[in-house]
Amino acid sequence: LPLDRLSDVDRYALARYGEVASRVLRAYDRYEFQTVVHTLNNYLTVDLSAFYVDISKDRLYTFGPGSDARRSAQTVIHTIADGLTRLVAPILPFTADEPWRNLPSADADSVHLADFPTGVDTLVDPELIDRWTRVLSLPGAVNGEMHKLSTEQVTGSAPAAAVPLPPHP
């Protein structure tokens, strides 16, 4: 699907990928391999595994093959899988070859003959990233307040609590 037909959360996932890929490419240019590894590891565990893949599963498993919601997630997952495979190839050469052989978009016989992703800076959308960062911070803030209220015995249980949300800017 084209970018303008992707869901908001899918555009956020793509924007975060663009941000991470840009940082990784700069680190490679500077031979800062520790930054490459740290950035990719954090992105894979926090952004992808703990968030995006988790919330995309329902759309991928239950929506019809032609639905925009499913195709939106598939488009983003494919773009990220292609780009990440290229980005990890220098540090995980054998590991990167396996997904590369299974990507329908693989444009070379080996990931090691393929170019790094280009144009990733254009995927970055600071306003979208900022908005989703605020949204994703809410559960932690709410849980922190709930814990504080329960230890102060202001409320006995979560259903009895009310948490005021900050106004939308």
Feature locations, PLM:
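Acidic, turn-prone loop/beta-hairpin segments
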Residues: 1-25, 53-145, 149-152, 158-167
